[in-house]
């Protein structure tokens, strides 16, 4: 394989923009499947990439299946990513291993809330992208509007590479502005590409749009700029070089268009992927050297260097755990010995395969830059595998904290065993899915990113693991904090025969207003009134006290603690004595520091026909929502608001019924905010009643 020609790409989009349909067409044109199936298939087959039973039924892509195709002797690994906010960890994970992406947009709806989330993730991982404006055959299609929205809403330098020949039901092809030719897609499934001269009625528009394209590209190539300014013809290769340079520098987003469903424009998009998106050689990747204070190391696409690979996705296959791996340096071969840098355990590579949606192809070897899968390796998602001669770790992926929890109870003994297996599997697969047993209620609690996220796992428990479970009401992950400053001076003393316990801790607590930090410990002890070896004990005690607040039993956050005095006893003082003194000191001051309750606030985006805008405002106002923005775009409206998570349970059902099923919403965690006094009293009462019972 020529690794200069390799492309690792993701297809990212808002839900229902036609992303899986586009992938399906790509598989078809690259001869990976022999018939095209629709997403919510009338033929009962479902799209090839949606291999989980649940995905085919719901018509949403949940797990990002990886597939390998070849287009005009360019090998391409495609990661199909989910478009639903509740599954963003899948998206984040895929982006971590990609070199380039196609951002799919609906030509009517344009840039939607999830497109914004996905774009933010693409920016976080510096992924170059092309835009594909899909569904140009839909009523109300306006690719020019979408191109403008890419600029206004996503701040992308979007430049048209094509213009449509006809829109809505008259959409029959596209004009390539670089080659100045018209392309039509004919024959069964659009396999015959017919190149013709541009229709006379579109020639003027094509010339104008080409001028605009060349103006935009002049920034990326001096030769192009000179020729263009002198009014000379610019060679095609120079135009292609400028587009590639701008795209790789993340300063240009080339815009292509068509209709995947109607088989228009997909092959030209594939040409663009090979021409303008990066090969692994074009991207800089780094690892941390764990033997050298996590020093950053540049990795090189070189088969002769020691192997470094990242496990980015786990799945249960029929032959055990299937681990998807991106090779960043060196090679993977059957029988090769590697080490997992997180666990320091050595293992041998067994079966090595290339994936096509859910079919496998055995291979002997994977080279630098490639994406392959391994069978039967024990690991967690995000682990780094490397040659035993080095100890590198790929920088860890950003993992958001869960915002919702749910109690799950197995219906019988068999279900209990199966549920335990399922939970073990899911927590390894998905770092945003967490589980624990509540000590007081003895219930198993699962936590995740939203109702749909947890709902899918409960369904999977039933289907894949035959675990019948009952679920409780969803619970919000509240937090407690303080709003004032309070002093403490606490002595812990215990004498009960033998060695006693003694420790005194004094100081104060105050609110911590530091972005991204929830606790700070400051040691101002002088003169050894608390010996140095017991300072960490105090720190540990304070952190222990913060695990469970006294208001409603949730963790305490955003506190700065300063200790400035204390006392010890030469015999009775110990690590545990100072831990307990700190816990007592914390509780003494906490009551005086005006504690309050915080709740997760979500950024909620509603989108639907303008006729329902009033209903959308009403629904948000009823839920303590603060409207932060609204946009009317002809017949289409979008409303953005900040709404407490506790008010959003069951919202999808309410929204459907009040907008005739025509509006949709997405939400993601934004911040924690103080609860109003009425809610504060309600939560306190509920907590106290539970404690009494």
From Swiss-Prot:
Keywords, comma-separated and alphabetical: Cytoplasm, Elongation factor, GTP-binding, Nucleotide-binding, Protein biosynthesis
GO cellular component assignments: cytoplasm
InterPro entries: EFG_II, EFG_III, EFG_III/V, EFG_IV, EFG_V-like, EFTu-like_2, G_TR_CS, P-loop_NTPase
One Pfam family in the UniProt entry: GTP_EFTU
Residues passing through the membrane, by range: none
SUPFAM superfamilies (alphabetical): EF-G C-terminal domain-like, P-loop containing nucleoside triphosphate hydrolases, Ribosomal protein S5 domain 2-like, Translation proteins
Known function: Catalyzes the GTP-dependent ribosomal translocation step during translation elongation. During this step, the ribosome changes from the pre-translocational (PRE) to the post-translocational (POST) state as the newly formed A-site-bound peptidyl-tRNA and P-site-bound deacylated tRNA move to the P and E sites, respectively. Catalyzes the coordinated movement of the two tRNA molecules, the mRNA and conformational changes in the ribosome.
Family under the similarity heading: Belongs to the TRAFAC class translation factor GTPase superfamily. Classic translation factor GTPase family. EF-G/EF-2 subfamily.
Protein name stated in the entry: Elongation factor G 1
Organism: Borreliella afzelii (strain PKo)
Taxonomic lineage from the root: Bacteria, Pseudomonadati, Spirochaetota, Spirochaetia, Spirochaetales
């Amino acid at each position: 394989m020529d690794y200069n020609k390799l492309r690792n790409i993701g297809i990212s989009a808002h839900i229902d923009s036609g992303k899986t349909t586009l992938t399906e067409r790509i598989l078809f044109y690259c001869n990976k499947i022999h018939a095209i199936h629709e997403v919510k298939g009338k033929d009962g087959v479902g799209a090839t990439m949606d291999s989980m039973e649940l995905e085919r039924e719901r018509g949403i892509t949940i797990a990002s299946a990886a597939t390998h195709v070849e287009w005009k002797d360019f090998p391409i690994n495609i990661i199909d990513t989910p478009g639903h906010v509740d599954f963003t960890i899948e998206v984040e994970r895929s982006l971590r291993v990609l070199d380039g992406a196609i951002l799919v947009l609906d030509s009517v709806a344009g840039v939607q809330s999830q497109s914004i989330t996905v774009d933010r993730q693409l920016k976080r991982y510096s992924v170059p992208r092309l835009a594909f404006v899909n569904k140009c055959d839909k009523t109300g299609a306006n690719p020019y509007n979408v191109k403008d929205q890419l600029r206004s809403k996503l701040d992308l330098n979007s430049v048209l590479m094509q213009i449509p020949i006809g829109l809505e039901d008259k959409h029959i092809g596209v004009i390539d502005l670089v080659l100045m030719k018209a392309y039509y897609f004919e024959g069964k499934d659009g396999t015959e590409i017919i190149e013709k001269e541009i229709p006379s009625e579109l020639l003027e528009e094509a010339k104008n749009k080409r001028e605009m394209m060349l103006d935009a590209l002049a920034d990326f190539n001096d030769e192009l700029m000179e020729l263009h300014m002198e009014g000379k013809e610019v060679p095609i290769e120079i135009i292609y070089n400028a587009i590639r340079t701008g795209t790789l520098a993340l300063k240009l987003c080339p815009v292509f268009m068509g209709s995947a469903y109607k088989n228009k424009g997909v092959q030209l998009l594939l040409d663009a992927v090979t021409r303008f998106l990066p090969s692994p050689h074009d991207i800089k990747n780094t690892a941390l050297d764990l033997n050298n204070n996590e020093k950053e190391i540049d990795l090189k696409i070189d088969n002769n260097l020691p192997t470094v690979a990242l496990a980015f996705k786990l799945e249960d296959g029929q032959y055990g755990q299937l681990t998807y791996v991106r090779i960043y340096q060196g090679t993977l071969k059957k029988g090769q010995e590697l080490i997992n840098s997180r666990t320091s355990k050595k293992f041998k590579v067994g079966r090595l395969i290339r994936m096509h949606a859910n079919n496998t192809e055995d291979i002997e070897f994977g080279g630098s830059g490639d994406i392959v899968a391994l069978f039967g390796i024990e690991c967690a998602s995000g682990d780094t595998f490397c040659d035993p001669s080095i100890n590198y770790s790929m920088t860890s992926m950003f993992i958001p904290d869960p915002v919702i929890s749910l109690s799950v109870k197995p219906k019988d003994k068999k279900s209990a065993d199966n549920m335990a297996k399922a939970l073990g599997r899911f927590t390894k697969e998905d770092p945003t899915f967490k589980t624990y047993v509540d000590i007081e209620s003895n219930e198993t609690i699962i936590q995740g990113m939203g109702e749909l996220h947890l709902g899918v796992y409960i369904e999977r428990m039933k289907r894949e693991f035959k675990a019948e479970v009952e679920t409780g009401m969803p619970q919000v992950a509240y937090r407690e904090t303080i709003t004032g400053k309070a002093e403490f001076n606490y002595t812990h003393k215990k004498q009960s025969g033998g060695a006693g316990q003694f420790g005194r801790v004094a100081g104060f607590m105050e609110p911590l207003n530091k972005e991204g930090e929830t606790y700070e410990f400051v040691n101002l002890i002088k003169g050894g009134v608390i010996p140095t070896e017991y300072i960490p004990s105090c720190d540990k005690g304070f952190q222990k006290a913060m695990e469970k607040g006294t208001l409603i039993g949730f963790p305490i956050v955003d506190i700065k603690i300063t200790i400035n005095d204390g006392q010890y006893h030469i015999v009775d003082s110990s690590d545990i004595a100072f831990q307990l003194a700190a816990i007592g000191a914390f509780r003494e001051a906490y009551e005086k520091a005006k504690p309050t309750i915080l709740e997760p606030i979500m950024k909620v985006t509603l989108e639907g026909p303008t006729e329902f805008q009033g209903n959308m405002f009403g629904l948000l106002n009823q839920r303590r929502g603060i409207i932060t923005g609204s946009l009317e775009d002809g017949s289409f409206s979008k409303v953005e608001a900040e709404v407490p998570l506790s008010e959003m349970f069951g919202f999808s059902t309410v929204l459907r019924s009040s907008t005739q099923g025509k509006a949709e919403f997405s939400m993601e965690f934004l911040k924690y905010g103080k609860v109003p006094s009425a809610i504060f009293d309600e939560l306190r009462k509920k907590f106290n009643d539970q404690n009494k019972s």
